[in-house]
C-alpha cells in the first residue's frame, strides 16, 4: 500500500486542511504514516503568517530533498508536495528555490490533489487558483480521530489588516451553507465527536445561507449545532472584534453548549498603532466589547494575539499595550515580534523598530501575560469542572482532556473514559496543564 506523510504548520485551519488531504489520499489507496522515510508522498502544509514560519518550510524541504535522493537510490519514488499559504503566496518560486518539489497547491485547490499527483508524473505542477466550485463538495466524508473535531464554517478575510497575508493567500470571506455544515456535524457526532470547534480565518463574520434562504449569523448557527445529538460542546476561532455582535454574545449567555472561552485578537493597545494596522477599532472599543462579553458570561476565559514592534511603534505605544493587558486580564495570549510579509502594506514602511527593542518589548509583554495565565490556573484550584477526556495522559494510568476554559487537565483514570465528560476537582497546577481527581458532579457555571 502507498503511504503519505503530512506535516502541518500554523493555524487550526491548516490542521483541518491536512486532515482532509489525508482523507482524499485515503480514497486513492494511501495509508497515512508518521514516518517520513516510509512515505511515497510527502506533503508540507505551510503557514505564511510570519517570516520564521515560511523559512522553516525551506529548511524542511532541504531534508525532504535528501530523503528523496536516498529513496531514489533504493528504487523508490517520492513525490514532494508544498501546500497551504506559502504555496499560495510564492507559487512557482518554490520550485525555483527547491527544485525537488513536484507539486505546489494552494489552500483553495487541494481538493484536486489526486489529479495533481497524477499530472506530476509528467512534470512539475503548480495550482494556486481560486476555483469557482466549492472545494468542500469534492472532499470525502470526514474521518473522526477523537472526541474533539474541527469544523470549517468560513474561509478568507475581507479586513485587510496592514500586516496580514490572509486576504491574499486565503481569498475573500466565504461562508459555507448551513445545511452542509449541519450534515458534516451530524457525521462527526455519529463518529464519536463530543466537541466541535468551528474554524475560519474570520469565523464570526460567518453569514452562510440557512435553510430559509437567508444568511445566518454565527450565534444562530451555534444554537442549531447545539441541537445535534451527541454534541455537548461548541467553540469557535478565530474572531475579529468588529464582528463580535450581540447575537453571538447572547449565545455565550444562553446556550450551555457554547464554552466559556473566547480568543479575540486585539494586536495592540495603542490607538495610533491600531489605526496603522488598519484594525478599524480603537482600544476603548475593545475594552467596551470585553465588558459586554463579561456581562453576558462572567466566568469567560479570554485569550488574544499581540504584535510588538509594528513599524513606528514607540515606547509610549508599547506602554499602552501593557496597560490594556493589565486592565483586561487574559488567561493566555499569543504574542510575536512583527515580521514584514511581502505584499502587505506594512512591509513597505521605512519606520522599522530595531530587533533589540522588539525582543525587549516582547519579553516584557510575555512576562505579564504568563503571570496572568498562571494566576488564572491557580484560581481554578479547588474548583470542580467538567473535563472532556480526549486521549491517554503523559504517564500510564493517566488520561488527558480539556476544561470548559480550554485548560489542559490530567487525571488518573482508565482509557475507557476517553470520549466522556467527567466532573474533575482541580488540585494542582503544572507548567502547562492542571491536575485533578474525579469528583461527584461539577457545579453550575457562574451566571
UniProtKB/Swiss-Prot annotation:
It comes from the Bacteria. It is an enzyme of class 2 (transferase). Binds 2 [4Fe-4S] clusters. One cluster is coordinated with 3 cysteines and an exchangeable S-adenosyl-L-methionine. The gene is miaB. The keyword Iron applies. Its EC number is 2.8.4.3. Residues 2-122 form the MTTase N-terminal domain. One of its GO terms (cellular component) is cytosol. Keywords: 4Fe-4S, Cytoplasm, Iron, Iron-sulfur, Metal-binding, S-adenosyl-L-methionine, Transferase, tRNA processing. It is found in: Cytoplasm. GO terms for molecular function: 4 iron, 4 sulfur cluster binding; metal ion binding; N6-isopentenyladenosine methylthiotransferase activity. It comes from Methylobacterium sp. (strain 4-46). Monomer. This is tRNA-2-methylthio-N(6)-dimethylallyladenosine synthase. Residues 143-375 form the Radical SAM core domain. InterPro entries: Elp3/MiaA/NifB-like_rSAM, Methylthiotransferase, Methylthiotransferase_CS, Methylthiotransferase_N, Methylthiotransferase_N_sf, MiaB_methiolase, rSAM, rSAM_horseshoe. [4Fe-4S] cluster 1 binds at residues 11, 47, 85.
Amino acid at each position: 500500500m502507498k503511504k503519505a506523510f503530512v506535516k502541518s504548520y500554523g493555524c487550526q485551519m491548516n490542521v483541518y486542511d491536512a486532515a482532509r488531504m489525508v482523507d482524499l489520499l485515503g480514497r486513492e489507496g494511501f495509508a497515512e504514516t508518521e514516518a517520513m522515510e516510509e512515505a511515497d508522498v510527502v506533503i508540507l502544509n505551510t503557514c505564511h503568517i510570519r517570516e520564521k514560519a515560511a523559512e522553516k518550510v525551506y529548511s524542511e524541504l532541504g531534508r525532504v530533498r535528501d530523503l528523496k535522493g536516498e529513496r531514489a537510490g533504493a528504487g523508490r519514488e517520492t513525490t514532494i508536495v508544498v501546500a497551504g499559504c506559502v504555496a499560495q503566496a510564492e507559487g512557482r518560486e518554490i520550485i525555483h528555490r527547491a527544485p525537488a518539489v513536484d507539486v505546489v497547491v494552494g489552500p483553495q485547490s487541494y481538493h484536486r490533489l489526486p489529479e495533481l499527483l497524477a499530472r506530476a508524473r509528467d512534470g512539475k505542477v503548480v495550482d494556486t487558483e481560486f476555483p469557482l466550485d466549492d472545494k468542500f463538495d469534492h472532499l470525502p466524508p470526514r474521518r473522526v480521530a477523537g472526541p474533539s473535531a474541527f469544523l470549517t464554517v468560513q474561509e478568507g478575510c475581507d479586513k485587510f489588516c496592514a500586516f496580514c497575508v490572509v486576504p491574499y493567500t486565503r481569498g475573500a470571506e466565504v461562508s459555507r451553507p448551513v445545511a452542509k455544515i449541519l450534515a458534516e456535524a451530524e457525521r462527526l457526532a455519529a463518529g464519536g465527536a463530543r466537541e466541535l470547534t468551528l474554524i475560519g480565518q474570520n469565523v464570526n463574520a460567518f453569514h452562510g445561507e440557512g435553510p430559509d434562504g437567508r444568511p445566518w449569523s454565527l450565534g444562530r448557527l451555534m444554537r442549531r449545532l447545539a441541537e445535534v445529538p451527541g454534541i455537548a460542546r461548541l467553540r469557535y476561532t478565530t474572531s475579529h472584534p468588529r464582528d463580535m455582535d450581540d447575537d453571538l454574545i447572547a449565545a455565550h449567555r444562553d446556550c450551555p453548549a457554547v464554552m466559556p472561552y473566547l480568543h479575540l485578537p486585539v494586536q495592540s493597545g495603542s490607538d495610533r498603532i491600531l489605526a496603522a494596522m488598519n484594525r478599524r477599532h480603537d482600544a476603548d472599543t475593545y475594552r467596551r466589547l470585553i465588558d459586554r462579553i463579561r456581562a453576558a458570561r462572567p466566568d469567560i476565559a479570554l485569550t488574544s494575539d499581540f504584535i510588538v514592534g509594528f513599524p513606528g511603534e514607540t515606547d509610549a505605544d508599547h506602554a499602552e499595550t501593557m496597560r490594556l493587558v493589565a486592565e483586561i486580564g487574559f488567561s493566555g495570549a499569543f504574542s510575536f515580534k512583527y515580521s514584514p510579509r511581502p505584499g502587505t502594506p506594512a512591509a513597505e514602511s521605512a519606520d522599522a523598530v530595531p530587533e533589540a527593542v522588539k525582543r525587549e518589548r516582547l519579553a516584557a509583554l510575555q512576562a505579564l501575560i504568563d503571570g496572568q495565565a498562571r494566576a488564572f490556573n491557580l484560581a481554578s484550584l479547588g474548583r470542580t469542572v467538567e473535563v472532556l477526556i480526549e486521549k491517554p495522559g503523559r504517564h500510564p494510568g493517566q488520561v488527558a482532556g480539556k476544561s470548559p476554559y480550554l485548560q489542559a487537565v490530567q487525571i488518573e483514570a482508565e482509557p475507557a473514559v476517553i470520549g466522556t465528560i467527567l466532573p474533575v476537582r482541580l488540585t494542582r497546577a503544572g507548567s502547562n496543564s492542571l491536575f485533578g481527581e474525579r469528583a461527584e458532579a461539577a457545579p453550575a457555571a457562574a451566571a
